[in-house]
UniProtKB/Swiss-Prot annotation:
Role description: Multidrug efflux pump that acts independently of NorA and is one of the factors that confers resistance against diverse quinolones and chemical compounds.
Family annotation (PANTHER family): MAJOR FACILITATOR SUPERFAMILY MULTIDRUG TRANSPORTER MFSC (PTHR42718:SF9)
Record key words, sorted: Antibiotic resistance, Cell membrane, Membrane, Transmembrane, Transmembrane helix, Transport
GO MF term set: transmembrane transporter activity
Organism of derivation: Staphylococcus aureus (strain COL)
GO terms of biological process kind: response to antibiotic
Transmembrane segments: 17-37, 53-73, 86-106, 107-127, 142-162, 165-185, 201-221, 230-250, 273-293, 299-319, 334-354, 357-377, 403-423, 435-455
A GO cellular-component term linked to this record: plasma membrane
Name of the protein in question: Quinolone resistance protein NorB
Record-stated family: Belongs to the major facilitator superfamily. TCR/Tet family.
InterPro entries hit by this protein: MFS, MFS_dom, MFS_trans_sf
Length: 463
């Protein structure tokens, strides 16, 4: 049961705009670095490995802490956690722009990850609390425009700002947007869960989760350098497997677990969350395709970002279409249609062996299908996950759902980048990009199968 300060409060457009602006601090601004990797190498006088760590660490830390933050939002207040997240983004952005020291870049990006971990589940919970029925679906559509739409715009946005104003302006603008979001959310009554007791936070679960995910990230990003037979590689693999096994055992026994596995008894929630993880994993497409056209075809970051304009346009248009399809067809069909269309787009973008002019045409069309598919998928998936969560666990459920988003993006970028680098070194940059993009298409196919098997045609939602 919810217990907001003013039970009669209903969500309005002012609050919704503040929520969307807070969401894009991660999905638009923080994610824009996928298209400015070469520029950051020069600006910080460092190697691509360090820059790739800085690019992926935000989503990684967001994913590691988002579930815990969702639980804290349920216990201590969703408005409070949202405001804390916005302030953390301002701090992280300041650390990134004040110097050319790579360590501060990484620390700033890490703090931005913590910011996103606070904002995402808290804002979804606010929507669950203060918007009802079609108003909630509308609010979720705009939330999806901030998240999926922001990820669609980020490549072009990052390239345009970096080319025209300088890359630091990405984060200057992020600070300005954060201040506006704080102003718009101010005055909204607090909402928190009444039924969850304030038990001790699951520190053991969080530590094990962090150890597991950091070990996996290092294995993916540095595995080829370490060598699969090296002692360090084997040790990290053992740590990852061991910490994962221990995490499962402890979480099932814990009275107040970091991840409540009972949520996954609902097939609709499980299907939405698992497919969400995989479709966020195809974010690796952006870093591979952008790096390929810059390194292989000699394009600038602005030119590379311009290829994805069709992605930008379609994802923004189709999110509201996805909302209407949800209302008329239910959740499963739009999720399947969106995923299928995305796979077609992914295959077109992977045709790196074509002559430049034909590849550019395929990229433009491919990104169009890419954005169209994600736009159709976004709102039905988010609504399925949130509507199937118990009201008293909505913060944790939203946290797990957005953990899937963040970790999918982090590992998608890391894995795609690793495959791209390894295959390029073994063959050439064209084959490396093609194989890495095929990996993303495979994730889309697996997502399609999961939706087909787990998401029911008519799921019973809690609206």
């Amino acid at each position: 049961m919810e217990k907001p300060s003013r039970e009669a409060f209903e969500g309005n457009n002012k609050l919704l705009i503040g929520i969307v602006l807070s969401v894009i601090t991660f999905w638009l601004f923080a994610q824009s670095l996928v298209n400015v990797v070469p520029i950051l190498e020069d600006s910080f006088n460092t190697d691509i490995g360090t820059v790739n760590i800085a690019v992926s660490i935000t989503a990684l830390f967001s994913g590691m802490f988002v579930v815990g933050a969702g639980g804290l939002a349920d216990k201590y207040g969703r408005i409070k956690l949202t405001n804390i997240g916005i302030i953390l983004n301002i701090l992280g952005s300041l650390l990134i722009i004040i110097s050319n020291i790579p360590l501060l870049l990484i620390i700033g990006r890490l703090i931005q990850g913590l910011s996103a971990a606070c904002i995402m589940p808290a804002t979804l919970s606010i929507i669950k609390s203060y918007y009802i029925g079609k108003d909630r679906q509308r609010a979720l559509s705009y939330w999806s425009i901030g998240s999926w739409g922001g990820s669609g715009v980020c490549s072009f946005f990052g390239g345009a700002v970096a080319t025209l104003l300088g890359w630091r302006w990405i984060f200057i603008l992020s600070i300005i947007i954060s201040l506006i979001a704080l102003f718009l959310i101010k005055g909204t009554p607090e909402t928190k869960s009444k039924s969850i007791s304030l038990n001790k936070f699951d520190i053991k679960g969080l530590v094990l989760l962090v150890i597991m995910l950091l070990s996996l990230n290092i294995l993916i990003t540095k595995g080829s350098e370490l060598g699969v037979t090296s002692l360090l590689f084997i040790t990290l693999l053992a740590i990852a497997i061991g910490s994962f096994s221990l995490f499962i055992v402890l979480e099932k026994r814990a009275t107040n677990p970091l991840i409540d596995f009972k949520l996954f008894k609902n097939k609709a929630y499980t299907g939405a969350t698992a497919s969400n993880f995989l479709l966020n994993g195809v974010a690796g497409t952006l870093i591979v395709a952008n790096t390929f056209v810059q390194r292989g075809l000699g394009y600038s970051s602005l030119q590379a970002g311009s290829l994805s304009i069709t992605y930008l346009v379609m994802v923004l248009i189709m999110i509201r279409v996805g909302e209407k399809l949800l209302q008329t067809l239910g959740c499963k069909k739009p999720m399947l249609i969106g995923t299928g269309v995305l796979i077609v787009g992914e295959c077109l973008i992977s045709l790196t062996f074509l002559p430049e002019i034909f590849y550019v045409i395929c990229c433009i069309i491919g990104y169009l299908f890419f954005g169209l598919g994600l736009g159709i998928y976004a709102t039905p998936s988010t609504d399925t996950a949130i509507a199937n969560a118990p009201l008293e666990k909505v913060g944790v459920a939203a946290g797990i759902y957005k953990m899937a988003s963040a970790l999918g993006g982090a590992f998608g970028v890391a894995l795609s980048g690793a495959v791209y680098a390894i295959v390029s070194n073994m063959t050439n940059i064209y084959t490396g990009a093609m194989i890495a993009l095929w990996l993303n298409a495979a994730m889309g196919i697996l997502s399609f199968v999961i939706i087909l098997l787990l998401v029911p045609k008519q799921n019973d939602t809690q609206l």
